[in-house]
Amino acid sequence: MEAYDICKFWKLDMLEEFSQIVLKGKKKIILDIPSPSQQNKSDIVSLCPADSPETCNSSIPDWLVKVMRKENGYDPKLIIKRRVLCTTDLRKNQGCLSMHLSKLEKSDFLTEDETRFLDEDFLKAKRDGLKVFLVDPESDKHVVYLKKWNGNTVWKYVLSHGWNNVIDKKIFKVNDVIEIWSFRDGSGKLCFALSSPTRCGRSSSGHSS
């Protein structure tokens, strides 16, 4: 009888120890579930391409993160950090926004196929351009055409056709300063995004959520 009691108490001790192990395991599982704020940070990191850590190290503005989430976007690249808009940029008879190759912060935003297309398109008498999307500071998306151009021995990319729709919104004024970014939407399509303009050291409102 005494041996039986000892065995019974030993089994109870083992059962209690096992229960503690299970309880600790459950607590660990609960602690390992990321909070909403942690999930948001994770989402932001996932916007950066694994093969371009330098992009992740640079500061991705909040407005661009919102735009990219809306488009399931990824691979953000700062194309031009400080683009001062001039009179010709806002003239509808010009109908394009230019980006001088010498002013580009990043020149690897095009795929090999896109680069080849633009090079071949440049040789045509009438250039078709590469169909891309442009997101303005009010988060409206426009269809525009990216072309390669050589004017006065200066190589540049231009966003044409749909640019006049942006002009019509009267978001920009002469001497406004903007940033130009690129990214890929969920289908891999090339997109450009424009920051809200800065005027006299102040940023105008834009990029609604």
Swiss-Prot record:
<keyword id="KW-0539">Nucleus</keyword>
<protein>
    <recommendedName>
        <fullName>B3 domain-containing protein At2g31420</fullName>
    </recommendedName>
</protein>
<feature type="DNA-binding region" description="TF-B3">
    <location>
        <begin position="101"/>
        <end position="198"/>
    </location>
</feature>
<dbReference type="GO" id="GO:0005634">
    <property type="term" value="C:nucleus"/>
</dbReference>
<dbReference type="InterPro" id="IPR003340">
    <property type="entry name" value="B3_DNA-bd"/>
</dbReference>
<dbReference type="GO" id="GO:0003677">
    <property type="term" value="F:DNA binding"/>
</dbReference>
<dbReference type="InterPro" id="IPR005508">
    <property type="entry name" value="At2g31720-like"/>
</dbReference>
<dbReference type="InterPro" id="IPR015300">
    <property type="entry name" value="DNA-bd_pseudobarrel_sf"/>
</dbReference>
<dbReference type="Pfam" id="PF03754">
    <property type="entry name" value="At2g31720-like"/>
</dbReference>
<keyword id="KW-0238">DNA-binding</keyword>
<keyword id="KW-0804">Transcription</keyword>
<keyword id="KW-0805">Transcription regulation</keyword>
